[in-house]
């Protein structure tokens, strides 16, 4: 290889990557967006650096620039250097390499894990084909050798039935499994630098802990450096050696993790830390409480502020009607999915939800928490009728919905609405915001076409958006704004029950706080009842009156929030608590020994019926499923 063509730079020996005064811009029709505006930092061998900030701060564009992927999305590196110490011991300025040379760098020297695995995986190739392609290209292995490495990587990231998964396609896996596939693919060639762009945002806490453990283990074994892009300060505290805080494309603060968390200098850093939901912040509180809002308008405004107000936890009003009959009563709900093999033969049933029961009072929030694949989303879809349950009863206002036909269900559908995890996927891209919100109003004949406009504008105002958003399309909105549209659409029919399925899991802390606070305000105003499905224990603790913990399709513990968080009994509940990252680097957990846990398959033979085990009552509203070595704690 001709060294004269490699743009070789002198660099500190221990530094894997050195970024100098990087500026990245996007040219729009009428203006230039300065996405990254003069950022500098370095990443040393074996070091983990976290780039933190809210949506739009420039952290993801910084990561994409290191891979030179901004070239494909309209971005342009206008100045600066990205110097890499390659595996072949060349010092390369990546800003000057062409895309052909960058293809040799990507996957081999630098790998990247993206936030959205479904858009990163090729839908027409199997998981095995996609992982082995990278291994064959960069390591020169045979197909058989590459397949063996791929199988080992799938096992490392704890995907159940690994041999089967390698022959499946991305759409056949859950979101959590797809993300683990992306991680396996990124680590398969043992890169010098792993860039992880929000890799655990949509994963539950135990899988998140396992992935963080896995990355740390590989980092130790091969001396890999890691660049974490995240808004989750708990993850930052758990993994980062150094932290770079970004706002409006600029670096506003840099320091060790302990310096940033214990003695943040910049007002924006202090406000970012204040907005982090903290597990245990509700001890002694009986009712849900709002989050602290982080209101950011400009970097200059932050520079001029000397103090950031950190409000104390303020409880909401008691909205629960405990004297009336339950609004929702679920009895023995069971949902199974038939899995077909070759030539349409029945291969077994997935026992997604297995014999669960609970009630919801008017004005109450029940938090349903558990790992990916535990059945919590299927529970919500089965209740509202998007998925047909196998058996069981769902009583809404005393009427068993499972016995109603489609025509009879119409009057109940408008009383129950759902907010989905991915607002972009659940909003029609061809419709304006006004049309999206007006659609259910028109379908149910609640307003004439002309009258619906004013109703839509009132709904927009109620979720914190003004009239200018009426004519916009979903792609013109931020993630937080799209989720507000989803809430406005859910409110359009004046429902009594809203099922929120991971409604805030992909939002950064400030937007998450705004959306959750809005939902609690609406509960106070309209007496709404929520089934709040989430894997985020800190959010669940903040919003819920009662909590149900799901594992392998069953509710294993249910009770008042204080009972679950202050006196958990089931081992799985305790495991969930232990896996939550704490936003304090001095309290980093040691390895949780979760990597060797086997994930039992939910696929059961045709005709299999599990033994029914009744829950044990521990106290008022507190129930637990019996478990091996059961010894209850006071």
Where are these regions (language model features)?
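Conserved ABC ATPase "signature" region
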Residues: 85, 145-164, 399-400, 451-468, ...
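Conserved ABC transporter NBD signature motif
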Residues: 77-92, 392-400
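Charged, flexible cofactor/metal-binding loops and thiol motifs
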Residues: 90-91, 163, 257-328, 340-344, ...
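Conserved ABC ATPase signature
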Residues: 168-173, 177, 473-477, 481
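Helix-to-loop junction immediately C-terminal to a conserved catalytic motif
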Residues: 67, 384
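A short, proline-enriched helix->beta-strand linker immediately N-terminal to the Walker B motif
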Residues: 188-192, 492-496, 512
């Amino acid at each position: 290889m001709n060294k004269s063509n490699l743009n070789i730079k002198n660099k500190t020996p221990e530094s894997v990557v050195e970024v100098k005064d990087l500026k990245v811009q996007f040219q729009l029709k009428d203006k230039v967006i300065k996405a990254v505006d003069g950022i500098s930092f370095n990443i040393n061998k074996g070091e983990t650096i976290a780039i933190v900030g809210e949506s739009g701060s420039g952290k993801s564009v910084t990561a994409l620039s290191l891979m030179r992927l901004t070239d494909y999305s309209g971005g342009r590196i206008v100045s600066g250097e990205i110097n890499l110490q390659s595996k072949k011991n060349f010092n390369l300025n990546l800003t000057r390499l062409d895309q052909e040379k960058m293809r040799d760098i990507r996957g081999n020297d630098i790998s990247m894990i993206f936030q959205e695995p479904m858009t990163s995986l090729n839908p027409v190739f199997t998981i095995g084909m996609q992982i082995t392609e990278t291994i064959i290209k960069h390591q020169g292995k045979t197909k058989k050798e590459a397949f063996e490495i791929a199988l080992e990587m799938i096992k490392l990231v704890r995907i159940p039935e690994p041999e089967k998964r390698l022959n499946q396609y991305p759409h056949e896996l859950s979101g959590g499994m797809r993300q683990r596939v992306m991680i396996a693919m990124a680590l398969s060639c043992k890169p010098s630098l792993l860039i992880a762009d929000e890799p655990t945002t949509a994963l539950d806490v135990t899988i998140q802990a396992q992935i963080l453990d896995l990355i740390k283990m590989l980092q130790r074994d091969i001396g890999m450096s890691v660049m974490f892009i995240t808004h989750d300060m708990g993850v930052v505290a758990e993994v980062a050696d150094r932290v770079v805080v970004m706002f409006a494309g600029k670096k506003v603060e840099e320091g060790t993790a302990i310096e940033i968390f214990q003695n943040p200098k910049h007002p924006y850093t202090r406000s970012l830390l204040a907005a982090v939901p903290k597990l245990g912040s509700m001890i002694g509180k009986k009712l849900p409480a709002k989050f602290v809002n982080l209101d950011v308008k400009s970097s200059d405004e932050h520079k001029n502020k000397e103090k950031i107000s950190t409000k104390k936890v303020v409880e909401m009003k008691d909205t629960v009607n405990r004297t009336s009959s339950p609004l929702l009563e679920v009895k023995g709900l069971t949902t199974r999915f038939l899995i077909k093999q070759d030539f349409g033969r029945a291969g077994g049933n997935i026992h997604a939800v297995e014999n669960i029961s609970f009630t919801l009072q008017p004005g109450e929030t029940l938090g349903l928490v558990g790992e990916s694949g535990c059945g919590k989303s299927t529970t919500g879809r089965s209740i509202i009728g998007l998925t047909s349950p196998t058996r069981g009863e769902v009583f809404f206002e005393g009427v068993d919905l499972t016995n109603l036909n489609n025509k009879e269900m119409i009057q109940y559908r408008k009383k129950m609405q759902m907010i989905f995890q991915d607002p972009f996927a659940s909003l029609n891209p061809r419709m304006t915001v006004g049309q999206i919100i007006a659609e259910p109003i028109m379908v149910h004949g609640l307003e004439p076409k002309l009258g619906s406009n004013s109703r839509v504008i009132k709904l927009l105002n109620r979720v914190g958006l003004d009239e200018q958003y009426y004519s916009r399309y979903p792609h013109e909105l931020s993630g937080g704004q799209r989720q507000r549209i989803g809430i406005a659409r859910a409110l359009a029919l004046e429902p009594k029950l809203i099922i929120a399925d991971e409604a805030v899991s992909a939002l950064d802390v400030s937007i998450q706080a705004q959306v959750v606070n809005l939902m609690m305000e609406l509960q106070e105003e309209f007496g709404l009842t929520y089934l709040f499905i989430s894997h985020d224990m800190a959010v669940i603790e903040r919003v819920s009156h009662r909590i149900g913990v799901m594992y392998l399709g069953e509710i294993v513990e249910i009770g008042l929030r204080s009972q679950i968080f202050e006196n958990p009994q089931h081992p799985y509940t305790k495991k969930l608590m232990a896996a939550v990252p704490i936003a304090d680097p001095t309290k980093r957990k040691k390895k949780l020994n979760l990597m060797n846990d086997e994930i039992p398959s939910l696929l059961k033979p045709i005709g299999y019926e599990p033994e029914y085990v009744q829950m044990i009552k521990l106290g008022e509203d507190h129930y637990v499923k019996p478990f091996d070595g059961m010894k209850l704690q006071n």
